Regions:
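Glycine-centered small-residue motifs that form tight turns
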Residues: 197-200
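Residues that cap or anchor secondary-structure elements
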Residues: 1-195
Length: 200
C-alpha cells in the first residue's frame, strides 16, 4: 500500500517517522499457502476514547518503528497504540500514561475502533475474544487474549464488543494506578501482512 509501513518479523533499524500522519492498521490476510489463495483486507483505526458517552475523537498519530515494534503516539488524548509480532500473533496494544479525564464520570473506560474491509468482527458471548469472518461466515482470524494491567501489575477486568463497523474495548479502571496497558492479540493460521494506514 502506498505510503504504508509494515511491522515485520526480525527487522532492524533505528526509530523513524512517516511522511504522512498514520491513523490505523491494515491487515492483509491470505487464507491458504498457495499464491492464488484468497486475500482479505481489514483496516482498524482507533477512533474514540473516553468514559461512557463522553468520548474524545482520536487524531492521527506520530509513527515510530523499532525493530519488530511499531508505535502510533497521540497527544490528545495521550495514548500510544502499538503493534508487535510475537509467537502468539500480532500484538495490538495501547499504553495510556495517565487517566483520560481528571474527573471520570464513574463509567468504564472505552476505546472504540472503526473497522472496515471485507472481514466482519463478531465478538463471542464471553466478551473476551472475537472472530473476523469473511462473506461466507468463516472465521479467518481472531482478536483475543485481552489483558489489561496497571502500574502495579494488577490485572483489570476488560471486555470487547463488536457492532456494525466497530469494535469496543471496555476497561474497569476506577481503582487503577496509571500508566495502563491494554494488550489483545491478532491470532491466525494464515499469512498476515500488517501495514500502517495514513490519515485522510
Amino acid at each position: 500500500m502506498s505510503g504504508s509501513t509494515a511491522p515485520r518479523r526480525r527487522t532492524r533499524g533505528t526509530a523513524s517517522s512517516a511522511p504522512s500522519p498514520p491513523a490505523g492498521l491494515r491487515l492483509d490476510v491470505r487464507t491458504g499457502d498457495a499464491a492464488h489463495a484468497p486475500v482479505h483486507s481489514v483496516t482498524w483505526r482507533l477512533e474514540r476514547l473516553g468514559y461512557g458517552a463522553a468520548q474524545q475523537q482520536v487524531p492521527a498519530g506520530v509513527l515510530k518503528t523499532e525493530g519488530a515494534r511499531v508505535e502510533l503516539a497521540r497527544a490528545t488524548p495521550r495514548v500510544t497504540e502499538w503493534f508487535q509480532n510475537s509467537p502468539a500473533g500480532l500484538e495490538h496494544g495501547f499504553t495510556l500514561p495517565e487517566r483520560p479525564s481528571a474527573n471520570p464520570p464513574g463509567e468504564p473506560l472505552r476505546l472504540v475502533m472503526a473497522v472496515t474491509g471485507d472481514l466482519v468482527p463478531e465478538a463471542d458471548a464471553t466478551g473476551q475474544s472475537l472472530n473476523l469472518r469473511n462473506a461466507a461466515g468463516r472465521a479467518v482470524m481472531s482478536y483475543a487474549k485481552l489483558k489489561v494491567w496497571d502500574a502495579t501489575g494488577a490485572e483489570l477486568p476488560a471486555t470487547m464488543q463488536s457492532a456494525a463497523g466497530s469494535v469496543t474495548l471496555t476497561v474497569s479502571e476506577a481503582t487503577a494506578r496509571y500508566p495502563l496497558t491494554i494488550d489483545p492479540v491478532f491470532a491466525q493460521q494464515a499469512y498476515v501482512k500488517a501495514s500502517v494506514v495514513p490519515h485522510k
